[in-house]
Amino acid sequence: MAFNGTVPSFCMDFTVYKVTISVILIILILVTVAGNVVVCLAVGLNRRLRSLTNCFIVSLAVTDLLLGLLVLPFSAIYQLSCKWSFSKVFCNIYTSLDVMLCTASILNLFMISLDRYCAVTDPLRYPVLITPARVAISLVFIWVISITLSFLSIHLGWNSRNETSKDNDTIVKCKVQVNEVYGLVDGLVTFYLPLLIMCITYFRIFKIAREQARRINHIGSWKAATIREHKATVTLAAVMGAFIICWFPYFTVFVYRGLKGDDAVNEVFEDVVLWLGYANSALNPILYAALNRDFRTAYHQLFCCRLASHNSHETSLRLNNSQLNRSQCQEPRWQEDKPLNLQVWSGTEVTAPQGATNR
């Protein structure tokens, strides 16, 4: 961690700036949390979306959701106060979670690209290649690697420079410290190499998909199935494209920090590229809805069911109140005493003593 340093001058004043940034960050956090919750609900409640491919999408959504719950609120507090308001131990946990969730996002997207490659290039053998057991092993692999690369390296100090931190528990800065080796290894292994493989994979997917579309143009049933696969591929490629746009600047700065040191990077620019990367977690649910019809349908059904249930509840309440008012208006002020019939749980009927009335 970077524990030393002073508060930047731009953080001292500018109330309007802080209010504007606060609104933007709050909206980003809310969209991230709500959007990824909806993705998980949509897959869980819609049978059409319960596929092996969507297991990786749910894993990605869970990753983004955890980022929105465990990292972004503290990042926003740190961004607005321009100092770390918590302990040094919690700083280590916070930065480890940040690195872990970022790595998990990359590996989920990497697995998604491999899944799409198998589905498009060899659809007949896809059920044999992509089995529930292999998907489960892949998900375990993703999270084990992510935890190892984050918590292990940071808590063992593999990323630290030859700087001694203060012994007290109060710190000003809290961000991942980067040395030359850690910057290059982490940047290459967790971002640039997976990114290169994903780009090659998607290029081959689109090339083969175009050839297949021409070859099966006159076969109706295969055409419908292939079009569905191609639409899913386009959607997931758009998700990966958004990931590149959002995270490529950050990892470039990350590697540059490792080579040149923290003083070589402007802090404002570093904050901008960091939050640009965080914004990717809010974009994925929007991309699903915009580019995938199955997810659009699931979202529509989810919100319509909630709205219909709410309207039905309100209508029922109004109807019951109306009937109650009508019965009260028609009821005489006094009634003859008559036997009161009481239904008990066993289904038998009990007659109340004479003098009990229906009230």
UniProtKB/Swiss-Prot annotation:
It is a multi-pass membrane protein. InterPro entries: GPCR_Rhodpsn, GPCR_Rhodpsn_7TM, Histamine_H2_rcpt. The record marks 98 as: Essential for histamine binding. The H2 subclass of histamine receptors mediates gastric acid secretion. The activity of this receptor is mediated by G proteins which activate adenylyl cyclase. Residues 45-57, 115-134, 205-234, 290-359 are cytoplasmic. The record marks 186 as: Essential for tiotidine binding and implicated in histamine binding. One of its GO terms (molecular function) is G protein-coupled serotonin receptor activity. Residues 1-22, 82-92, 160-180, 259-267 are extracellular. Belongs to the G-protein coupled receptor 1 family. The keyword Glycoprotein applies. The chain crosses the membrane at residues 23-44, 58-81, 93-114, 135-159, 181-204, 235-258, 268-289. It comes from Cavia porcellus. This is Histamine H2 receptor. The keyword tRNA-binding does not apply. Glycans are attached at residue 4. SUPFAM superfamilies: Family A G protein-coupled receptor-like. GO terms for cellular component: dendrite; plasma membrane; synapse. Keywords: Cell membrane, Disulfide bond, G-protein coupled receptor, Glycoprotein, Lipoprotein, Membrane, Palmitate, Receptor, Transducer, Transmembrane, Transmembrane helix. The lineage of its organism: Eukaryota, Metazoa, Chordata, Craniata, Vertebrata. GO terms for biological process: chemical synaptic transmission; G protein-coupled receptor signaling pathway, coupled to cyclic nucleotide second messenger; gastric acid secretion; positive regulation of vasoconstriction. It is found in: Cell membrane.
